[in-house]
């Protein structure tokens, strides 16, 4: 996945920020630096929030809204990215509680594909967006954080995770599901052959019992 553009409005410490990732992403290596609390980790939270409506640390997404945001301003993340030659955009608006209101102002989400400047909406409902994002990227939110983000302090957690969890993450990373399916088919075929062989063996034994060789 190649990030193209990230726009943040009332998100964490960012009142309104636009980052053109395509201007630096082709560099062999780049570094995001800044003082503690300046918003470095918030950028990765923005990726995860936009795609999965989650945070990298599992904290409440309501905490992503800028503390000093005016009630009339919505918290919005717009994330453009490229994958397998296709340009996608996901725009997500955070639900929030206005001062004096008892009910939340609802959030919104829209996933679209952009081709030659033409926007095609792929999904606008939360469950549909979740399913489509996982289909496009090939990872759920937990796998995305482990493989793409790997938040601070989580590397040790990944190393200490059980074998099955590691296996699933590495399968997703190296896209080896096809080979696993092939292995499963071979194993099932081998079991079928073995069952047929044993069946024929029993049938032959039964037939030989009918003969008297004395």
Regions found by a protein language model. Name each.
Residues 31, 49, 118, 124, ...:
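Extended, Lys/Glu-rich alpha-helical coiled-coil stalks
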Residues 1-131, 141-143:
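Extreme N-terminal "head/tail" segments of very large remodeling/mechanoenzyme assemblies
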């Amino acid at each position: 996945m190649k990030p193209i553009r990230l726009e943040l409005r009332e998100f964490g410490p960012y009142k309104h920020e636009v980052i053109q990732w395509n201007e630096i992403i082709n560099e062999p290596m780049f570094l995001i630096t800044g003082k503690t609390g300046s918003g470095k980790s918030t950028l990765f939270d923005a990726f995860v929030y936009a795609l999965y409506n989650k945070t990298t640390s599992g904290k409440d997404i309501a905490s992503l809204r800028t503390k000093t945001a005016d009630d009339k301003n919505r918290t919005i993340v717009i994330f453009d990215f490229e994958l397998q030659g296709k340009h996608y955009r996901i725009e997500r608006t955070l639900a929030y509680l206005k001062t004096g209101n008892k009910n939340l102002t609802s959030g919104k989400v829209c996933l679209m594909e952009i081709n030659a400047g033409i926007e095609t909406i792929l999904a606008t409902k939360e469950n549909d967006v979740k399913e489509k994002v996982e289909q496009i990227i090939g990872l759920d939110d937990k796998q995305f954080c482990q493989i793409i983000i790997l938040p601070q302090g989580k590397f040790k957690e990944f190393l200490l995770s059980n074998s099955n969890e590691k296996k699933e993450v590495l399968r997703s990373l190296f896209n080896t599901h096809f080979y696993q399916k092939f292995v499963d088919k071979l194993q099932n075929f081998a079991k079928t052959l073995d069952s047929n062989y044993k069946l024929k063996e029993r049938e032959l034994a039964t037939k030989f019992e009918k003969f008297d060789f004395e």
